[in-house]
């Protein structure tokens, strides 16, 4: 399918008093629409930006221009059909107009294929273009690119706990938030109102689901609670506490005395050994003294016997 050539005579002359923002007047065989960025009109040549013969461009705030075209055998004012191509003007890759802009250069106009979002202007039709309600779509999407409906907020119904443990049984836990919503709000009255098991706490008054216990504690902490109760019952009698303390003191005293006696026994033994050694040394010295005197006397007697009598 080819497009018919557009001549200046076939294009309606531009009227500055008429609003061309929505769409141009019906043309037999060709239809031109402009959105926000610029206007196409025939015979308008006041602006220095010229495209073709007898075809002018009136630019607005943005530098993008779009063309919507299609062939129709008959004109319908209620519906339009737009398809084909998109024309996007770039100024050397910069969306802003520079001082050295050359409108006649081929590098300034770039054809950009668009296939982002369909925007129909009527009911889609599978027939030819002669139908007035043919489906058309712009080749550039406008507005928000988020295809979700406005006001839609996805709701997160579950939030994993950061301290989740696979070894912990969560079946016996009680949903406090649901209890508060249903009107049940247990209050904590004492320091033993909560039991901590592996870093997870349970409020007093919560009833385990899968167990028959009614003491307010889960199955994971029941054994510890029984031990605490047994210890509290044993320590409840003050006389027993006094007796146990006295017994402990006497045992400590006996141990201290035994250690003292052991120390004294060791010291006495060492002292007796030292005295025994001292006595032995004295006996040896006395024996040596007596031996010396005996030798001296014996020598004196022998000398007297050798002298002759005169």
From Swiss-Prot:
The modification Phosphoserine is found at residues 77, 105. The keyword Transcription does not apply. Transmembrane segments: none annotated. GO terms for cellular component: plant-type vacuole. Keywords: Phosphoprotein. Residues 208-221 have a biased composition (Polar residues). Residues 1-58, 115-135, 152-171, 177-221 are annotated as: Disordered. Residues 14-25 have a biased composition (Acidic residues). Disruption phenotype: No visible phenotype under normal growth conditions. InterPro entries: ASIL1/2-like (IPR044823). Interacts with FRI. Interacts with WAV3. This is Protein FIP2. It comes from Arabidopsis thaliana.
């Amino acid at each position: 399918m080819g497009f018919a050539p557009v001549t200046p005579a076939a294009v309606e002359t531009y009227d500055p008093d008429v609003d061309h923002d929505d769409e141009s007047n019906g043309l037999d065989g060709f239809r031109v629409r402009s959105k926000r960025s610029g206007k196409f009109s025939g015979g308008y040549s006041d602006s220095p930006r010229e495209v073709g013969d007898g075809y002018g461009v009136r630019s607005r705030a943005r530098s993008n221009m779009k063309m919507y075209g299609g062939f129709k055998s008959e004109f319908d004012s209620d519906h339009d059909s737009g398809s084909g191509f998109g024309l996007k003007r770039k100024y050397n890759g910069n969306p802003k107009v520079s001082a050295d802009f050359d409108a006649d250069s081929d590098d300034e106009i770039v054809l950009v294929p668009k296939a982002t979002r369909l925007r129909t202007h009527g009911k889609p039709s599978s027939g030819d273009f002669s139908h007035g309600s043919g489906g058309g779509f712009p080749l550039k999407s406008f507005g928000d690119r988020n295809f979700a409906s406005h006001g839609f907020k996805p709701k997160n119904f579950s939030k994993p706990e950061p301290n989740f443990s696979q070894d912990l049984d969560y079946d016996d836990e009680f949903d406090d938030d649901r209890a508060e919503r249903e009107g049940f709000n247990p209050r904590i009255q004492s320091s033993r109102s909560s039991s901590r098991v592996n870093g997870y706490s349970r409020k007093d008054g919560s009833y385990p689901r899968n167990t028959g216990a009614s003491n307010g504690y889960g199955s994971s902490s029941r054994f510890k609670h029984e031990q605490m109760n047994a210890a509290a019952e044993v320590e409840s009698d003050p006389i027993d506490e006094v007796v146990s303390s006295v017994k402990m003191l006497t045992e400590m005293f006996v141990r201290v005395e035994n250690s003292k006696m052991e120390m004294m026994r060791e010291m006495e033994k060492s002292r007796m050994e030292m005295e025994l050694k001292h006595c032995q040394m004295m006996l040896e010295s006395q024996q040596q003294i007596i031996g010396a005197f005996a030798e001296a006397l014996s020598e004196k007697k022998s000398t007297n016997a050798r002298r002759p009598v005169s």
